[in-house]
Curated annotation (Swiss-Prot):
CC cofactor note: Binds 1 zinc ion.
Residues the record lists as binding Zn(2+): 102, 129, 132
Keywords for the protein's UniProt record, in alphabetical order: Hydrolase, Metal-binding, Zinc
InterPro entries: APOBEC/CMP_deaminase_Zn-bd, CMP_dCMP_dom, Cyd/dCyd_deaminase_Zn-bd, Cyt/Deoxycyt_deaminase, Cyt_deam_dimer, Cytidine_deaminase-like, Cytidine_deaminase_bacteria
Listed name of the protein: Cytidine deaminase
CMP/dCMP-type deaminase domain boundaries: 48-168, 186-294
A family per Pfam: dCMP_cyt_deam_1
Gene Ontology CC entries for this record: cytosol
Organism: Escherichia coli O7:K1 (strain IAI39 / ExPEC)
Length: 294
């Protein structure tokens, strides 16, 4: 079991501990539960889906990286496939506060970058901030997404974001988590190709500035993040954050990164290079390359 889970695991009910122990035994537990695993946990504990998600939130929150706030938020995004995806907030010392990742963004990106097609619900241990409510409104589930909070009845996103502004106001038809392929040729080594593939999946209807980041760890594992724009602009999630979300949730740490590649267009209206390289250097990665989409 990864050490970060030990305290939260010890506080779970005995029957949930017994059912989870073989799942968490792998140090690189992928911070997700398949539909089959969810069904098994429900049978072992007698909990329904909502109660089980609440019970698992401490494990999601244990994935948080909060050196500034020490305020750990966990989220679980429930995909239409039946898979549940953990998420947690992340803060980066030496970077800017604008690089911060919120738990809801983490769980949603985890699902999206894992190939999930849409979300049914998200469970969070604290009420979503306005930034996250706006981020969720970019999803193809839209205002129907169900939000579950401890001690409250579940409500749709529309109840938390009345009179919402979103992609439909800008006549955007392709939404976040819809399948997209921008068709750039995969060239270069494996890491460069991973970054280009991530750029091909970008959701960037507002700036038309595709980008993707791929991180290579010392053991050869590669984590890729795609750019995810938002109708309100500021809640946009950069591609580096997508890759860092996966790296963190899958049990790796920043010193494990040995090389990074950013893929973007040289003449794009928005350029990721400066922010990406500055944040990576703050995390200790200095081997950073850029490949141009063509």
């Amino acid at each position: 079991m990864h050490p970060r889970f030990q305290t939260a695991f010890a506080q779970l009910a005995d029957n949930l501990q017994s059912a989870l122990e073989p799942i968490l035994a792998d140090k690189y537990f992928p911070a997700l539960l398949t539909g089959e695993q969810v069904s098994s946990l429900k049978s072992a504990t007698g909990l329904d889906e909502d109660a089980l998600a609440f019970a698992l939130l401490p494990l999601a929150a244990a994935c948080a990286r909060t050196p500034l706030s020490n305020f750990n938020v966990g989220a679980i995004a429930r995909g239409v496939s039946g898979t549940w995806y953990f998420g947690a907030n992340m803060e980066f010392i030496g970077a800017t506060m604008q690089q911060t990742v919120h738990a809801e963004q983490s769980a949603i990106s985890h699902a999206w970058l894992s190939g999930e097609k849409a979300l049914e619900a998200i469970t969070v241990n604290y009420t979503p901030c306005g930034h996250c409510r706006q981020f969720m409104n970019e999803l193809n589930s839209g205002l129907d997404l169900r939000i579950h909070l401890p001690g409250r009845e579940a409500h749709a996103l529309r109840d938390y974001l009345p009179d919402a502004f979103g992609p439909k106001d800008l006549e955007i038809k392709t939404l976040l988590m819809d399948e997209q392929d921008h068709g750039y040729a995969l060239t270069g080594d494996a890491l460069s190709q991973a970054a280009i593939a991530a750029a091909n999946r970008s959701h960037m209807p507002y700036s038309k500035s595709p980008s993707g980041v791929a991180l290579e760890c010392k053991d050869g594992r590669i984590f890729s993040g795609s750019y995810a724009e938002n109708a309100a602009f500021n809640p946009t999630l950069p591609p580096l954050q997508g890759a860092l979300i996966l790296l963190n949730l899958k049990g790796y740490d920043y010193p494990d990164i040995q090389r990074a590649v950013l893929a973007e267009k040289a003449d794009a209206p928005l350029i990721q290079w400066d922010a990406t390289s500055a944040t990576l250097k703050a995390l200790g990665c200095h081997s950073i390359d850029r490949v141009l989409l063509a």
